[in-house]
């Protein structure tokens, strides 16, 4: 049985908490796409864990964690994360030999190109994700399994650098020496080599077990279905998770969509419900809305039903979790976007271009006292009405309501 968790907004929805909450029900937790640009924070027993590449299942001692073929792996970051744990998590970690590797030149390219874009900057995290995926598509990328034969890999990379010397010179990027390259690759092999395997076959061999596919980033950042070009470089929707793991669609049991009780976005790109006034500032401060990966303040605004319904439909969600409801405590009124207006015309669907979209809002009464509530009946009545309103508009059951950072601060309906 395979369940899947996917973000419904622009990322940072709190997927890690729900994965951590339900991971005890799963034998295998799989990360299927993205790279260390994805950051999620999980709080357990008061201790905060910031994960970028590792699946959230690492906090469950009984789960095997898989980094799938669709992930782009920066070995330095992965080694750093593994070492940050007091106990040995390697015994329960597998890395796909087909997952592509981010090398330092990918990061240098990413940062140099973003700088050259000037005012047209996309807002990339500068972690080398796009260039690594670009090399994958161009069929010149490096896969984790190639660490098994370092001399052959070095030969391949030397040829790559020779072919791209003009481009590197244009961007002002220094090509690493062979000795430095060899030293780094040997360290990667020493630290990670024993974990690299055919994870697709492993998953096929264990289809009788309970599995959880954990998406990174979120629907509105999908390379095809998101707010292009202000998107990530992979398919972040449910179908992308299947491609990034090798799991067949027929094996999928349930899709759980994750959304905040409001909306946030990091970096550039359209954001119809953004509030750059006092309300947005209050949400940011009460919600601690600063990027796990970059530390950048997130842009904040109101819940967007149109975007959420679009995401729920794209992913085929069976149920939804609404996160950080407690952040909206203390507002006299809360807004919900129920439609868009473009050139005076009202629409209720998510268009491919959002630049000229204006939100159409309804206002609901606010509430106080939702923090750390664990039972539906204990939530303030107006908070209940808020959840029920969103549930009706998106047409999918809201099963989980998060009321705090701790794992147990969750209402399960």
UniProtKB/Swiss-Prot annotation:
Its EC number is 6.3.4.4. Pathway: Purine metabolism; AMP biosynthesis via de novo pathway; AMP from IMP: step 1/2. InterPro entries: Adenylosuccin_syn_GTP-bd, Adenylosuccin_syn_Lys_AS, Adenylosuccinate_synth_dom1, Adenylosuccinate_synth_dom2, Adenylosuccinate_synth_dom3, Adenylosuccinate_synthetase, P-loop_NTPase. Mg(2+) binds at residues 12, 39. GO terms for molecular function: adenylosuccinate synthase activity; GTP binding; magnesium ion binding. It catalyses: IMP + L-aspartate + GTP = N(6)-(1,2-dicarboxyethyl)-AMP + GDP + phosphate + 2 H(+). GO terms for biological process: 'de novo' AMP biosynthetic process; IMP metabolic process. Binds 1 Mg(2+) ion per subunit. The active site is at 12 (proton acceptor), 40 (proton donor). Belongs to the adenylosuccinate synthetase family. HAMAP family: Adenylosucc_synth (MF_00011). Plays an important role in the de novo pathway of purine nucleotide biosynthesis. Catalyzes the first committed step in the biosynthesis of AMP from IMP. This is Adenylosuccinate synthetase. It comes from Nautilia profundicola (strain ATCC BAA-1463 / DSM 18972 / AmH). The gene is purA.
């Amino acid at each position: 049985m395979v369940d899947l968790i996917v973000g419904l907004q622009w990322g940072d929805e709190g997927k890690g908490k729900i994965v951590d909450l339900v991971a005890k029900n799963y034998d295998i937790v799989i990360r299927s796409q993205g790279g260390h640009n994805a950051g999620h924070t999980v709080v357990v027993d008061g201790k905060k864990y910031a994960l970028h590449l590792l699946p959230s299942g690492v906090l469950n001692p009984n789960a095997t964690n898989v980094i799938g073929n669709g992930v782009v792996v920066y070995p330095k970051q992965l080694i750093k994360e593994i070492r940050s744990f007091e106990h040995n998590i390697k015994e329960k970690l597998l890395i796909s030999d087909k997952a592509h590797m981010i090398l330092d030149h990918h990061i240098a390219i990413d940062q140099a190109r973003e700088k050259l874009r000037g005012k047209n900057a996309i807002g990339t995290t500068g972690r080398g994700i796009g260039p690594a995926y670009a090399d994958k598509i161009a069929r010149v990328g490096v896969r984790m399994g190639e660490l098994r034969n370092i001399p052959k890999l070095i030969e391949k990379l030397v040829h790559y650098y020779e072919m791209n010397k003009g481009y590197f010179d244009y961007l002002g990027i220094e090509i690493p020496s062979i000795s430095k390259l060899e030293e780094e690759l040997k360290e990667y092999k020493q630290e990670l080599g024993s974990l690299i395997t055919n994870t697709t076959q492993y998953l096929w061999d264990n289809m009788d077990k309970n599995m959880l596919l954990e998406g990174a980033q979120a629907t509105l950042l999908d390379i095809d279905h998101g707010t292009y070009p202000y998107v990530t470089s992979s398919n972040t929707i449910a179908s992308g998770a299947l491609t990034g793991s090798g799991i067949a669609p027929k094996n999928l049991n349930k899709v759980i969509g994750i959304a905040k009780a409001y909306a946030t976005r990091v970096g550039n790109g359209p954001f119809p419900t953004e509030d750059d006034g006092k309300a947005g500032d209050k949400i940011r401060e009460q919600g601690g809305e600063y990027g796990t990966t970059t530390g950048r303040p997130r842009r904040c605004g109101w819940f967007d039903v149109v975007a959420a319904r679009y995401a729920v439909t794209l992913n085929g969600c069976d149920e939804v979790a609404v996160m950080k409801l407690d952040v909206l405590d203390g507002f006299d009124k809360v807004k919900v976007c129920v439609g868009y207006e473009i050139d005076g015309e009202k629409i209720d669907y998510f268009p491919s271009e959002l630049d000229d979209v204006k939100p159409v809002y309804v206002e609901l009464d606010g509430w106080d006292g939702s923090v750390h509530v664990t039972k539906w009946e204990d939530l303030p009545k107006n908070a209940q009405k808020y959840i029920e309103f969103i549930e009706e508009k998106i047409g999918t059951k809201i099963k989980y309501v998060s009321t705090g950072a701790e794992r147990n601060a969750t209402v399960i309906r």
